[in-house]
């Protein structure tokens, strides 16, 4: 892919002629400063997605595979490109490695944009048709999609080694110029250069841009529809649960505590009595908040935030690779163009494209808090505190999940409360009573409880603070 050299490395000539060599060494130093962050940053991305459960979703699995491609660029492509620059673009390695190196170069750059295209398509389907997409959400199916992306990339790049190695041991007419520079010669690979640029970049880029704008449009529409349904504002903390009412004929039953005096849930309140007044009957009727609606709004907010981050990744990738592919097609179609100028532009734009492999981890660090925290822990080797916290959270979550699976919607509150006592759930807070129990004295009470979620909603005008004590 490199069709021009920078300048000869001369060390045994007079001082005035050493300037090109000095400039070349500075360029090599800058290139090394690009290679090292590319390798380190993408290793951090792979570790974060592999180890952090919060980051293990379909989009991030694609990003991890993208990081693998970028990591391989830093390990296999950039160092050899640096060597060719140090040797004045003369290929210093065994000649059969030239088509293999060109194959890896095309493969990884193609895989990068194919991953971004697959991410945009997968996210659009997930937002547009969540029910259908949920059927293909398992890790195995995501890995199958990733394998398909790599397979497509391999199929696009495979003509290079096939055509190059087939002409060995006389590959000079295939991948080497008269200066023994390892390149895709336009007279031999003209059709491949045009076809590869269209299939590997311009067509996926067009699809990706269309899908991205459609995704943003769908998200905005869903947010608008969801917000239009929310016409109630709450001025005090709320704990939202899902209750089943008895039939109208059944009289209200008082809540019976179990033998230990523990209730189903407990809450510790710290109330500022100044300026607080008891809510009226109309205000109490607004104290039921839809947990599902709140969760949907949070989900859409997260999707919008993720779309912005991916939009930045898309934009940077396009800005950094578009000049190379435009120049690449120009070199194949423009016969009268100066080969030296085209070659130098190809060399510069190739390295601009390589830089994009090291920028993605920086984008994740700046715009994603979970990635940023994970990177900080990995760099500082701080695993012990994080592991103990995660184990404690996992133990508490699993304990509560086991109890919730035994709660029956047909059992009474007191019977369900005994499950917490049997599991030795202890806390030292005051008993909690549902806000729905204070609605009206004649209202029906609930005998069956389905603990969907306990949701605390805080507003600016509220001075009352509540804390749910689970363990």
From Swiss-Prot:
Tissue occurrence: Detected in brain, heart and gut.
Pfam families: 7tm_1
PDZ-binding (motif): residue ranges: 469-471
Subcellular location(s) per record: Cell membrane; Synapse, Synaptosome
Stated family: Belongs to the G-protein coupled receptor 1 family.
Binding-site residues for ergotamine, renumbered to this chain: 105, 110, 184
Gene Ontology CC, one term: dendrite
Source superkingdom: Eukaryota
Transmembrane segments: 27-49, 61-83, 100-121, 142-162, 192-214, 309-329, 345-366
Keywords, ordered alphabetically: Behavior, Cell membrane, Disulfide bond, G-protein coupled receptor, Glycoprotein, Lipoprotein, Membrane, Palmitate, Receptor, Synapse, Synaptosome, Transducer, Transmembrane, Transmembrane helix
Motif interval(s): NPxxY motif: 360-364
Extracellular side: 1-26, 84-99, 163-191, 330-344
InterPro entries per UniProt: 5HT2B_rcpt, 5HT_rcpt, GPCR_Rhodpsn, GPCR_Rhodpsn_7TM
Cytoplasmic side: 50-60, 122-141, 215-308, 367-471
Protein name: 5-hydroxytryptamine receptor 2B
Function field: G-protein coupled receptor for 5-hydroxytryptamine (serotonin). Also functions as a receptor for various ergot alkaloid derivatives and psychoactive substances. Ligand binding causes a conformation change that triggers signaling via guanine nucleotide-binding proteins (G proteins) and modulates the activity of downstream effectors.
SUPFAM superfamilies: Family A G protein-coupled receptor-like (SSF81321)
GO MF, one annotated term: neurotransmitter receptor activity
Domain notes: Ligands are bound in a hydrophobic pocket formed by the transmembrane helices.
A GO BP entry: phospholipase C-activating serotonin receptor signaling pathway
Short motif ([DE]RFG motif): ranges: 187-190
């Amino acid at each position: 892919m490199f069709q021009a050299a920078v300048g000869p490395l001369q060390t045994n000539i007079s001082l005035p002629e050493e300037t090109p060599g000095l400039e070349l060494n500075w360029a090599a130093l800058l290139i090394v400063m690009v290679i090292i962050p590319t390798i380190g940053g993408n290793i951090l991305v792979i570790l974060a997605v592999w180890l952090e459960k919060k980051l293990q979703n379909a989009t991030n699995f694609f990003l991890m595979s993208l990081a693998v491609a970028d990591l391989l660029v830093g390990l296999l492509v950039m160092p050899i490109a640096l060597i060719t620059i140090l040797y004045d673009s003369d290929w210093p390695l065994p000649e059969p490695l030239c088509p293999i190196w060109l194959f890896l170069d095309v493969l990884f750059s193609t895989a990068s944009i194919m991953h971004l295209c697959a991410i945009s398509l997968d996210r659009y389907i997930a937002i547009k048709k969540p029910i259908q997409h949920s059927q293909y959400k398992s890790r195995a199916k995501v890995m199958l999609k990733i394998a398909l992306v790599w397979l497509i990339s391999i199929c696009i790049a495979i003509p290079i080694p096939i055509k190059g190695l087939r002409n060995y041991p006389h590959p000079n007419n295939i991948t080497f110029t008269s200066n023994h520079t390892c390149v895709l010669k336009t007279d031999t690979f003209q059709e491949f250069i045009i076809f590869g640029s269209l299939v590997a970049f311009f067509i996926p880029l067009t699809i990706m841009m269309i899908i991205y704008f459609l995704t943003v449009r769908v998200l905005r529409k869903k947010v608008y529809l969801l917000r239009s349904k929310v016409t109630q504002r709450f001025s005090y903390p709320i704990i939202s649960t899902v209750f089943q009412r008895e039939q109208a004929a059944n009289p209200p039953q008082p809540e019976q505590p179990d033998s230990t005096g523990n209730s189903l849930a407990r809450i510790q309140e710290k109330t500022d009595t100044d300026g607080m007044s008891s809510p009226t009957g109309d205000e109490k009727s607004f104290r039921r908040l839809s947990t599902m609606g709140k969760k949907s709004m949070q989900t859409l907010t997260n999707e919008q935030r993720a779309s912005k981050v991916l939009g930045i990744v898309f934009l940077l990738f396009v800005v950094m690779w578009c000049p190379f592919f435009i120049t690449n097609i120009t070199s194949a179609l423009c016969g009268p163009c100066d080969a030296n100028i085209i070659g130098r532009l190809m060399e510069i734009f190739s390295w601009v494209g390589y830089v994009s492999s090291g920028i993605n981890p920086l984008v994740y660090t700046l715009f994603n808090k979970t990635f940023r925290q994970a990177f900080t822990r990995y760099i500082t080797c701080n695993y012990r505190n994080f592991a103990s916290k995660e184990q404690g959270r996992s133990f508490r979550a699993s304990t509560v999940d086991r109890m919730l699976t035994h709660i029956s919607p047909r059992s009474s509150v007191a019977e369900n409360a005994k499950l917490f006592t049997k599991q030795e759930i202890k806390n030292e807070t005051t008993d909690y009573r549902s806000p729905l129990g204070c609605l009206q004295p004649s209202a029906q009470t609930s005998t069956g409880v389905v603990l969907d979620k306990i949701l605390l909603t805080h507003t600016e005008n509220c001075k009352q603070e509540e804390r749910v004590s689970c363990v």
